[in-house]
Curated annotation (Swiss-Prot):
Its EC number is 1.17.1.8. It catalyses: (S)-2,3,4,5-tetrahydrodipicolinate + NAD(+) + H2O = (2S,4S)-4-hydroxy-2,3,4,5-tetrahydrodipicolinate + NADH + H(+); (S)-2,3,4,5-tetrahydrodipicolinate + NADP(+) + H2O = (2S,4S)-4-hydroxy-2,3,4,5-tetrahydrodipicolinate + NADPH + H(+). SUPFAM superfamilies: Glyceraldehyde-3-phosphate dehydrogenase-like, C-terminal domain, NAD(P)-binding Rossmann-fold domains. (S)-2,3,4,5-tetrahydrodipicolinate binds at residues 160, 169-170. The lineage of its organism: Bacteria, Pseudomonadati, Pseudomonadota, Gammaproteobacteria, Enterobacterales. This is 4-hydroxy-tetrahydrodipicolinate reductase. It comes from Salmonella typhimurium (strain LT2 / SGSC1412 / ATCC 700720).
Length: 273
């Protein structure tokens, strides 16, 4: 194996995101697909991961046991569901494997487990691995510092019908970026639903609206609205490959890290801007 290469394992190999990750891993220079995982009992077990993803034969067989492939990867990439990700996290912590986590919907206990594991292993944990989204988060911080104290702030997000959590992790990250720039805690100022007689809008709050429809990959808009004008900052994703490439880029970046909790802005160096 070339010194620059890093071997990755992909969780949820048969899912929409898993297949994109396999394609990206097989195409990206410096990355080697080392393992592909599916749940116990899946009809996809025993398949060639590359053929499953439509990327050609890879020689990597889809398996259900992390123990069986523990020597085949350096970084584990997980875009599944919180309960599965936390199981994988415990394994990676035990065996000293890095992780790239794109799973959303964690409760506070799950997030704390990730923080604790990062004391021993290196983790990139991000709500969205798109370069464009992370540039947007930086722009939101700057817009909030200028407009946030006198404008009404609303975040609108849209995803496909199969997404199971709301608001999206990216929408929450947008809210946290804005709230942080205003020296607020999002938990204290977020409004997640409006129905019936709500009264007038409460100043200083951040509203969220959610759409679930069709096959929308992901659309996010933050609105800063004042009397007579408004500024909207929008990101639209047309392919999951942008998230997959960002995740693989993060795995390569982790190569030199022993431990710590990072996000995509660290990978891209956006905090120095």
């Amino acid at each position: 194996m070339h010194e620059a290469q890093i071997r990755v394992a992909i969780a949820g190999a048969g899912g929409r995101m898993g297949r994109q990750l396999i394609q990206a891993a097989m195409a990206m220079e410096g990355v080697q697909l080392g393992a592909a995982l599916e749940r116990e009992g899946s009809s996809l077990l025993g398949s060639d991961a590359g053929e499953l993803a439509g990327a050609g034969k890879s020689g990597v067989i889809v398996q259900s046991s992390l123990e069986a492939v523990k020597d085949d990867f350096d970084v584990f990439i997980d875009f599944t569901r919180p309960e599965g990700t936390l199981t994988h996290l415990a394994f990676c912590r035990q065996h000293g494997k890095g992780m790239v986590i794109g799973t959303t919907g964690f409760d506070d206990a799950g997030k704390q487990a990730i923080r604790e594991a990062s004391q021993e292993i290196a983790i990139v944990f991000a709500a969205n691995f798109s370069v464009g989204v992370n540039v947007m988060l930086k722009l939101l911080e700057k817009a909030a510092k200028v407009m946030g104290d006198y404008s009404d702030i609303e975040i609108i997000e849209a995803h496909h019908r199969h997404k199971v959590d709301a608001p999206s992790g990216t929408a929450l990250a947008m809210g946290e970026a804005i709230a942080g720039a205003l020296d607020k805690n999002l938990k204290d100022c977020a409004v997640y639903s409006r129905e019936g007689y709500t009264g007038e809008r409460v100043a200083g709050t951040i509203g969220f609206a959610t759409v679930r429809a069709g096959d929308i990959v992901g659309e996010h808009t933050a609105m800063f609205a004042d009397i007579g004008e408004r500024v909207e900052i929008t990101h639209k994703a047309s392919s999951r490959m942008t998230f997959a490439n960002g995740a693989l880029r993060s795995a390569l970046w982790l190569k030199t890290k022993k431990n710590g909790l990072f996000d995509m802005r660290d990978v891209l160096g956006l905090d120095v801007l």
